Swiss-Prot record:
The gene is ispDF. A divalent metal cation binds at residues 250, 252, 284. It catalyses: 2-C-methyl-D-erythritol 4-phosphate + CTP + H(+) = 4-CDP-2-C-methyl-D-erythritol + diphosphate; 4-CDP-2-C-methyl-D-erythritol 2-phosphate = 2-C-methyl-D-erythritol 2,4-cyclic diphosphate + CMP. It comes from the Bacteria. This is Bifunctional enzyme IspD/IspF. 4-CDP-2-C-methyl-D-erythritol 2-phosphate binds at residues 250-252, 276-277, 298-300, 374-377, 381, 384. It comes from Sinorhizobium medicae (strain WSM419) (Ensifer medicae). The keyword Zinc-finger does not apply. Pfam families: IspD, YgbB.
Length: 404
């Protein structure tokens, strides 16, 4: 069996529909309508363009849409080699045209996807690929039906309630062994079977077991005009990054000792910082800054000084805890900045080691970690060498629409 990194799938993107239910538009069928500043089909193709399992790609379009597709292709965010073929009078015939075009491309598996489902992701593609690797001949992503279903009768009356147990809503991409689904499509065409609504139905008809994998609630099909409006709103929201900045401040008293710990780095000195933990004033300030980006309180809420467990504790525990909370809430730490205010010891000789320490604790690149130091010009308690203060700023990007 192929190794996962070598297991690629041919892709057929079905884009030959007319989309009457979405209403007429000067932009053409719904796959060419603009959502999030680009045609729908470009969002769909970009997902495949950035997935590591994408093999040969065939796009099936309507014969009248060549100019529309050529224009849309120029708007793609990523390069993608693809073949364009013309579809038939029905979706079923369009898919058959795509299968026949990809049959000589040297792939054993194929994914068939609706162009008007732009909100699938790599995780869904990975689940489909894993099922194919495990030997499935047909794979269907689907979501369990959550709504109560009613069967209607004449006059707009309810005839019965349909039990929803074991019912699933089918999605795409639907994935198959290429040889098997091509044969099934050819058999269906030869026998005059032309009323299948998806490719999994053809596989079922041909006796191919269809394996379910978890779909995605976001992977909805753009069918009606309101779907296009929802898609535009969703893509617009996704395009605006949720960037948050948190600030933190801390100060600790200097007492007789043999050194101070700043940013997790011990610096020999004739004094030390007094505190319940190791009194790393820099990490305490940065911990508060991270917690502030998601409204998670402050360091005292999570590690109260009255708790003996934290007596003498290394402060990297506090910072890593805050970073974990940020990530659990969908945040990506993009920058950390610390300003130390002290008369002594000199921070400059240790600055690079401090940045390396922060980089390791936060699991971010060192160029995203900044440490600066200044004196207080002999003014105040810092100027009298009675303590060290720290001001920290954390920048975090949260997943748009996520809870924080």
């Amino acid at each position: 069996m192929q190794a996962e990194e070598q297991f690629s799938c041919g892709v057929i993107v079905v884009a030959a529909g007319r989309g009457e239910r979405a209403g007429q538009s000067s932009e053409g069928p719904k796959q060419y309508r603009t959502v999030g500043d680009r045609p729908v089909i470009t969002h769909t193709l970009d997902v495949f363009a950035t997935w590591d399992g994408t093999g040969p790609v065939v796009v099936v379009i309507h014969p009248e849409d060549e100019e529309l597709f050529a224009s849309a292709r120029k708007r793609m965010g990523h390069m993608l080699d693809l073949t364009v073929v013309h579809g038939g009078a029905t979706r079923q015939l369009s898919v058959l045209a795509g299968l026949q075009a990809i049959a000589g491309a040297g792939v054993k598996h194929v994914m068939i996807h609706d162009a008007v489902r732009p909100f699938f992701d790599h995780a869904l593609l990975d689940r489909c690929r894993a099922a194919l690797r495990n030997g499935a001949g047909a794979v269907l992503p689907a979501v369990a039906v959550a709504d109560t279903l009613k069967r209607a009768q004449a006059g707009g009356l309810v005839a019965e309630t349909v039990p929803r147990t074991d019912l699933h809503a089918a999605q795409t991409p639907q994935c198959f062994r290429l040889e098997a689904i091509l044969s099934a499509h050819r058999q269906a065409a030869a026998s005059g079977q032309a009323d299948f609504t998806d490719d999994a139905s053809i596989a079922e008809w041909a006796g191919i077991p269809v394996h379910l994998v978890e779909g995605s609630p976001d992977n909805f099909k753009l069918t009606l005009r309101r779907d296009l409006s929802m898609a535009d709103e969703k893509l617009t929201r996704m395009a605006i990054p949720d960037v948050r900045t948190g600030n933190g401040y801390d100060v600790h008293q200097l007492v007789e000792g043999d050194g101070v710990t700043l940013c997790g780095v011990f610096i020999p000195h004739d004094r030390k910082l007094s505190g319940h933990s190791d009194a790393d004033v820099a990490l305490h300030a940065l911990t508060d800054a991270l917690l502030a980006t998601c409204g998670a309180g402050d360091i005292g809420d999570h590690f109260p000084p009255s708790d003996p467990r934290w007596k003498g504790a290394p402060s990297h525990i506090f910072l890593e805890h805050a970073a974990r909370i940020v990530r659990e809430r969908g945040g990506t730490i993009t920058h950390a900045d610390i300003s130390l205010i002290a008369e002594a010891p000199k921070v400059g000789p240790h600055r690079q080691q401090m940045r390396e320490s922060l980089s390791a604790m936060l699991a971010i690149a060192i160029d995203r970690c900044s440490v600066k130091a200044t004196t207080n010009e002999k003014l105040g308690f810092v100027g009298r060498n009675e303590g060290i203060a720290a001001i920290a700023t954390a920048t975090v990007v949260y997943a748009s629409g996520g809870d924080a």
